[in-house]
């Protein structure tokens, strides 16, 4: 029997596909929702590049640049508390603490003023990045998808339903209890409402989309055997450890 996540996914399929026998099981990536038995079925993961001024500066970029976007596959999600295998083809895996916005109502060309009505809730996240692969791709002016969109590269905590989060909420990242990143949500160059407005001008957002809203300054490496914990005031943490 199909579980609730798969039933919800099937309900969103085109009518002609609903009774189709597929060669493989339909993927059903999802995230836990605080206080609910239902889970948040994930459709897509969008990420915002350079959305904190100090982080842009530490990589030599102009913090006034408009927001730009890239994707991670939905099945890159891993829940908080997971022990991960260290990723292949990298010697410089970096943490990036991020606020995650969960979209509950879709739309295209959403205005900043109406953006909150499209939000389901918020979560803590970690946009894991193979920094050496990213640097190499950038130096050759090639796409850097494989530095971001790899297996188990999106650690996401439990989603807390809500329409807004305080700009004074702190966002922090610790590696083995050493504080690496420490900022406030209000330090974003482009606030959540403007991120949603900009992204929805490129693509129609849909229920189930997640938006990782950028990381503050202080990104750095996480080695084999180390643990990494991201905290945002008022939200459950997103924590993982790389096995030895």
State where each predicted segment sits:
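Extended, compositionally biased flexible segments
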Residues: 17-120
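Short amphipathic alpha-helical "recognition" segments used for binding
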Residues: 8-9, 16, 100-102, 182
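N-terminal amphipathic/basic-hydrophobic helices that include classical n-h-c signal peptides
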Residues: 1-19
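Catalytic-pocket segment enriched in acidic/His residues
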Residues: 17-39, 55, 61-63, 123, ...
């Amino acid at each position: 029997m199909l579980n609730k996540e798969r039933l919800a996914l099937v309900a969103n399929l085109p009518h002609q596909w609903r009774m189709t026998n597929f060669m493989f099981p339909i993927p059903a990536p999802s995230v836990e929702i605080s206080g609910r038995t239902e889970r948040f079925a994930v459709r897509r993961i969008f990420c915002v590049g350079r959305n904190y001024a100090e982080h842009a500066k530490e990589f030599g970029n102009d913090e006034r640049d408009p927001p730009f976007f890239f994707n991670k596959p939905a099945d890159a999600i891993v829940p908080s508390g997971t022990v991960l295998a260290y990723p292949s083809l990298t010697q410089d895996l970096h943490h990036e603490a991020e606020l995650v916005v969960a979209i509950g109502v879709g739309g295209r060309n959403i205005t900043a003023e109406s953006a909150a009505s499209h939000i389901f809730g918020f979560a803590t996240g970690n946009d894991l990045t193979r920094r050496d692969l990213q640097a190499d791709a950038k130096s050759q002016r090639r796409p850097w998808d494989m530095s971001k969109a790899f297996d188990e590269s999106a650690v996401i905590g439990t989603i807390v339903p809500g329409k807004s989060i305080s700009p004074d909420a702190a966002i922090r990242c610790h590696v083995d209890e050493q504080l690496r990143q420490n900022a406030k949500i209000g330090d974003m160059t482009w606030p959540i409402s403007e991120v949603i407005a900009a992204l929805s001008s490129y693509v129609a957002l849909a229920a189930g989309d997640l938006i990782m809203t950028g990381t503050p300054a202080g990104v750095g490496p996480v080695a084999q055997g180390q643990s990494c914990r991201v905290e945002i005031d008022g939200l459950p943490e997103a924590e993982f450890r790389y096995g030895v």
